[in-house]
């Protein structure tokens, strides 16, 4: 049985929560996020807290309640503080730049790679070899970071490629003669 669902999500000041059936909308200074809740989960909104309870008749109700609690907590953190993800470009001549909502990458192809950012996500390049993604939706930030990384994943012999800032690339030993 999940213990995650037993902890309530505290709603800070300045965050507005609307519960309409199984659709919840959380609005804060960084934007508005909406999510549809699984039928196995029942949510109560009282005195600046969201509490979760499983519904009878569902085998995975406690698991769904714990998952829902984690997702809604991430939504609350996203609309108040926001999320960031940092990518590094490692390799000779690998560069990144941001123009509007487009990330331009020079990562060893014969042409520059242009990646359109979805709504609600902003990117900046503190240096030519770093990309900083910011936004309110944790899932979308991770998805965009994974898409950018997929253009040139770190290779195991020299470590060249696009990597997450906290990623450790294991380097293989070269073949001996």
From Swiss-Prot:
Gene3D superfamilies: Ribosomal protein L6, alpha-beta domain. GO terms for biological process: cytoplasmic translation. It comes from the Bacteria. PROSITE patterns: RIBOSOMAL_L6_1. The keyword Transcription regulation does not apply. Disulfide bonds: none annotated. Keywords: Ribonucleoprotein, Ribosomal protein, RNA-binding, rRNA-binding. It holds the Pfam family Ribosomal_L6. One of its GO terms (cellular component) is cytosolic large ribosomal subunit. Belongs to the universal ribosomal protein uL6 family. This protein binds to the 23S rRNA, and is important in its secondary structure. It is located near the subunit interface in the base of the L7/L12 stalk, and near the tRNA binding site of the peptidyltransferase center. HAMAP family: Ribosomal_uL6_B. This is Large ribosomal subunit protein uL6. It comes from Proteus mirabilis (strain HI4320).
């Amino acid at each position: 049985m999940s213990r995650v669902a037993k902890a309530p999500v505290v709603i800070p000041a300045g965050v507005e929560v609307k519960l309409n059936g199984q659709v919840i909308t959380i609005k804060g200074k960084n934007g508005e996020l909406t999510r549809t809740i699984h039928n196995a989960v029942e949510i109560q909104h009282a005195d600046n807290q969201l509490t979760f309870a499983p519904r009878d008749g569902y085998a995975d109700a406690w698991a769904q309640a714990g998952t829902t609690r984690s997702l809604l907590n991430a939504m609350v953190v996203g609309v108040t503080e926001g999320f960031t993800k940092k990518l590094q470009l490692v390799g000779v001549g690998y560069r990144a730049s941001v123009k509007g909502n487009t990330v331009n990458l020079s990562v060893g192809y014969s042409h520059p790679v242009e990646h359109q950012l979805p709504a609600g996500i902003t990117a900046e390049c503190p240096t030519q070899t770093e990309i900083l993604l910011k936004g309110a939706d944790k899932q979308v930030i991770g998805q965009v970071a994974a898409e950018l990384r997929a253009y040139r994943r770190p290779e195991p012999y020299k470590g060249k490629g696009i990597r997450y800032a906290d990623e450790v690339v294991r380097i293989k030993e070269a073949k001996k003669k």
